[in-house]
């Protein structure tokens, strides 16, 4: 059957989800039944001369029927538990919490279908179909990042992808010392400081030239346990995901090597502070292993200025200083699709609004994306590696993380070959297991991601439209909150937003007018969370659901102080409380970009919040 390409603007997102009220439920069932029937037929048609091992007589036996009934009872219990205790994040406009939402129907169907084969993508021989799909997905990741010779693969989640990124950086940074030991002519004339500040491309070029001695050089690298502290500091923004600390622990460089970089009042890495740290370390002859920039921070959705991190590196190279750059775009990575045309070209900023209008990316023609965010996304192509999670803004079921590398040759620095699953030098169509951290991995995940990418291309015509819906929905929610006040008994409760969203996350607080006690405000917001989550009972009957987080001094320093001051709290009060508690909405719903639809839900949300505040203040 021919796969017809849709014309510009024809992609209808409403056809790709089961739907808030299961509007496409019958379509999902029909497609699933067709796929299951195909699998059953595939089983039946293999070696038709073989007789069935489960006989008709067996299927009518008493023990068989009892076993089937027992299985049904277990499944009924699972159904009861799932329906009773699950979070209804499929809802169009009532869930405003974690990074979860509707999942794409083609991804669900592909996962349902492929899991019947139970492929293990660690080895091609156990999963020929899905291993090839994963290899294609990896190249699609690379194209999304504008990597010309890149490579990528699926991992279980962003934490493992971050660990793998640090693994790459650690091993690459240590290679010059290994070359000095094994083949010193490769780095002749370089001081130890110069060896510690060699650009990644130069290192990979030298490694490639070593030919037959590559394995010996690798054996003398950081994988041997040598040079782990000597290779330098790992710099992360204060908005870092906690997985970076775990990665430093596991990878062996240690937590003492991790330095948090302050963020500005927009919760983006402060580039001036970054430069101070790097130059200060250089004065003490301490190298920087690498710098992490975040695109879509976990708690604010902030987009670090990747372009400025790269520009600073370029400037520092004049002084003989170099660092590896990893972009943690676990949340925001798929957002790059909104900037790519159908030929994978990065759209000029001055043309962006017109192109978005042409493809129906946004309902309203205006500046939805700032120049700062645009420049940050464009510069991702200059970073060595990127974390990207399909199970976040890819709208793909868990678990599906991903990592992408700029230069396919980099994968050799972490490769291991086990003869029983992959033979070194063998001509295997899709060799994954030798170049990844994980062992066994679900082929169904690869099929799920592959299906999503082929229904929704990774450009403005496909995922760009889905990402745009999310961004526009977040702007509606942000504007709605900014206009909110509540009369609760004799109290007036104001709503204040943290920052205008860089991407699609909205953080906000409730504040009692006239209150100058930050601890009391924090308690109010925690109480709102309790009433808007599983904490206070059956979440299925909750009319508004959200999440929360704390911005505390040990993690954020004084970055939240400007926001805290804007609420009327003094510096002394900030120091006394030590944190500010905010409510957090990752606005992933694909339905709230339509202002008319949002306006249907807005009074419902307001009424639900009014009720929760009255419960908190015990207003009868």
UniProtKB/Swiss-Prot annotation:
Keywords linked to the UniProt accession: Coiled coil, Decarboxylase, Lyase, Pyridoxal phosphate, Stress response
Catalytic activity from the UniProt record: L-tyrosine + H(+) = tyramine + CO2; L-dopa + H(+) = dopamine + CO2
Organism domain of life: Bacteria
Disruption phenotype: Cells lacking the tdc cluster (tyrS, tdc/tdcA, tyrP and nhaC-2) lose the ability to produce tyramine, and show reduced viability under acidic pHs in the presence of tyrosine.
Cofactor: pyridoxal 5'-phosphate
Regulation: Levodopa decarboxylation is not inhibited by carbidopa, benserazide, and methyldopa, that are three human L-dopa decarboxylase inhibitors.
Keyword Cell wall biogenesis/degradation listed: no
Disulfides per UniProt: none
E.C. number(s) listed in UniProt: 4.1.1.25, 4.1.1.-
Family named by the database record: Belongs to the group II decarboxylase family. Tyrosine decarboxylase subfamily.
Protein name as catalogued: L-tyrosine decarboxylase
Lineage: Bacteria, Bacillati, Bacillota, Bacilli, Lactobacillales
């Amino acid at each position: 059957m021919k796969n017809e390409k849709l014309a510009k603007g024809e992609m209808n997102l409403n056809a790709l989800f089961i739907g808030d009220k299961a509007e496409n439920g019958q379509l999902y069932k029909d497609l699933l039944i067709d796929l299951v029937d195909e699998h059953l037929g595939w089983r039946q048609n293999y070696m038709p001369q073989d007789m069935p091992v489960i006989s008709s007589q067996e299927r009518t036996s008493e023990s068989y029927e009892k076993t089937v009934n027992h299985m049904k009872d277990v499944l009924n219990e699972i159904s009861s538990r799932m329906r009773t205790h699950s979070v209804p994040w499929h809802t169009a406009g009532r869930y405003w919490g974690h990074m979860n939402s509707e999942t794409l129907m083609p991804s669900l169907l592909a996962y349902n279908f492929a899991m019947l084969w139970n492929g293990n993508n660690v080895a091609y021989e156990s999963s020929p179909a899905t291993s090839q799909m994963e290899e294609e997905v990896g190249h699609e990741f690379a194209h999304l990042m504008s990597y010309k010779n890149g490579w990528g693969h699926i991992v279980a989640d962003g934490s493992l992808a971050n660990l793998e990124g640090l693994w790459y950086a650690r091993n690459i940074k240590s290679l010059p010392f290994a070359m000095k030991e094994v083949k010193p002519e490769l780095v002749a004339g370089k001081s130890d400081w110069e060896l510690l500040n060699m650009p990644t491309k130069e290192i990979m070029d030298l490694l490639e030239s070593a030919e037959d001695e590559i394995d010996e050089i690798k054996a003398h690298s950081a994988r041997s346990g040598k040079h782990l502290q000597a290779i330098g500091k790992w710099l992360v923004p204060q908005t870092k995901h906690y997985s970076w600390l775990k990665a430093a622990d596991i990878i062996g460089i240690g937590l003492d090597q991790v330095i948090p970089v302050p963020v500005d009042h927009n919760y983006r890495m402060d580039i001036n502070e970054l430069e101070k740290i790097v130059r200060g370390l250089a004065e003490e002859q301490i190298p920087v292993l690498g710098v992490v920039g975040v695109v879509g921070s976990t708690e604010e959705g902030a987009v670090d200025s990747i372009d400025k991190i790269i520009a600073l590196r370029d400037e520092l190279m004049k002084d003989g200083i170099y660092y590896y750059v990893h972009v943690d775009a676990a949340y925001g990575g798929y957002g790059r699709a909104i900037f790519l045309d159908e030929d994978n070209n990065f759209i000029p900023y001055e043309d962006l609004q017109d192109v978005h209008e042409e493809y129906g990316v946004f309902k309203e023609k205006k500046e939805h994306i700032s120049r700062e965010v645009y420049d940050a996304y464009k510069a991702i192509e200059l970073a060595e590696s990127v974390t990207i999670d399909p199970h976040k803004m890819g709208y793909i079921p868990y678990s599906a993380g991903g990592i992408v590398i700029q230069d396919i040759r980099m994968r050799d620095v972490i490769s291991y070959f086990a003869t029983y699953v992959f033979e070194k030098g063998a001509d295997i169509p899709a060799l994954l297991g030798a170049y990844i951290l994980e062992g066994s991995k679900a082929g169904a995940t690869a099929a799920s991601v592959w299906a999503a990418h082929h229904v929704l291309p990774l450009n403005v015509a496909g995922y760009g439209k889905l990402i745009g819906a999310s961004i526009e929905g977040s702007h509606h929610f942000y504007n709605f909150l900014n206009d909110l006040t509540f009369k609760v008994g004799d109290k007036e409760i104001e709503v204040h937003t943290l920052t205008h969203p860089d991407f699609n996350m909205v953080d906000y607080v409730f504040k009692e007018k006239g209150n100058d006690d930050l601890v009391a405000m924090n308690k109010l917001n925690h109480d709102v969370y309790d009433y808007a989550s599983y904490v206070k009972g059956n979440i299925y009957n909750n009319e508004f659901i959200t999440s929360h987080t704390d911005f505390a001094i040990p993690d954020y320093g004084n970055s939240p102080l400007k926001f805290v001051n804007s609420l009327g709290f003094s510096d002394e009060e900030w120091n006394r409380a030590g944190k500010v508690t905010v409510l957090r909405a990752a606005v992933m719903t694909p339905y709230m970009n339509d202002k008319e639809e949002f306006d249907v839900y807005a009074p419902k949300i307001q009424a639900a919040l009014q009720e929760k505040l009255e419960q908190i203040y015990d207003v009868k």
